[in-house]
Amino acid sequence: HPAAEGGVTAASLVADLCADGSRLPVYWCGMYAPCMALFFPVFIEGDLPEVLSVGGGGYSDDSPWWMFYALGQEGFAGGPDRMKEIHEGWWDLQKGMFGSAYAMAGQARGMIDAGDRDAASKMLTDYMAENTANILRVGREILSGAAARTS
């Protein structure tokens, strides 16, 4: 949660390693404050979508981090009810990624073990790109709903 001076966590990463080697590790990334963020799976065996690197010192509609920042600020300003609405807006997408990430991690592990690292990398790259597109779409929908309520 925000400190009195307005500071918050800039991002979070949770590494879900696999002791038995049956799947790849799943790295769950949350941009901005963990209490307001959606966590999405990333795999180092694939290529991250370039849009995730868009940032800068000021707000940009093209930046996922700034979108998460705006959602966080909306939630903090709106209090517990608004935070709950934002979480509910994310829930189906979050639940879907919780369900699909580990299947992808297992499938990619099998492909790599069978010698098809390139195909595994492409599959994971495509998976992360699809998730990122969905995250940006849903996040923008939540923000545009907030803008409509205030106008």
Language-model segments: which ranges?
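C-terminus-biased signal that marks the final domain/tail of proteins
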Residues: 1-151
